[in-house]
């Protein structure tokens, strides 16, 4: 993650926007040497907002933990198995 002074961002905003769109890295913008803002791509913001919405859903965190435990224990059906079940009909 890059840390860039506000004055530099002001002068090269278009370049920094292109950089975060391409790399999906965050840029911390400082004012008087202290973090003041963070520049991220619109796609990354949408992803963060979607994740927060899921985590706000009652029971979602527990369901995710249970699902990960099931996968780790081998309790899952692969895409190929599902495809074979439905194409065999």
Curated annotation (Swiss-Prot):
Pfam family, one: PhdYeFM_antitox
Keyword DNA-binding listed: yes
Keywords: DNA-binding, Repressor, Toxin-antitoxin system, Transcription, Transcription regulation
InterPro entries per the UniProt record, alphabetical: Antitoxin_Phd/YefM, phD/YefM_antitoxin, YefM-like_sf
Gene for this chain: relB
Family assignment from sequence similarity: Belongs to the phD/YefM antitoxin family.
Molecular functions (GO terms): DNA-binding transcription factor activity; sequence-specific DNA binding; toxin sequestering activity
The keyword Transcription is assigned to this record: yes
Quaternary context: Interacts with toxin RelE, which neutralizes its toxicity. Also interacts with toxins RelG and RelK in vitro, in M.smegmatis coexpression with non-cognate toxins neutralizes the toxicity of RelG while increasing the toxicity of RelK.
Name by which UniProt lists this protein: Antitoxin RelB
PANTHER family documented for this protein: ANTITOXIN YAFN, ANTITOXIN YAFN-RELATED
Protein purpose: Antitoxin component of a type II toxin-antitoxin (TA) system. Upon expression in M.smegmatis neutralizes the effect of toxin RelE.
Other comment: Was identified as a high-confidence drug target.
Protein's GO biological process: positive regulation of growth; regulation of DNA-templated transcription
Entry's induction text: Expressed in log phase cells. A member of the relBE operon.
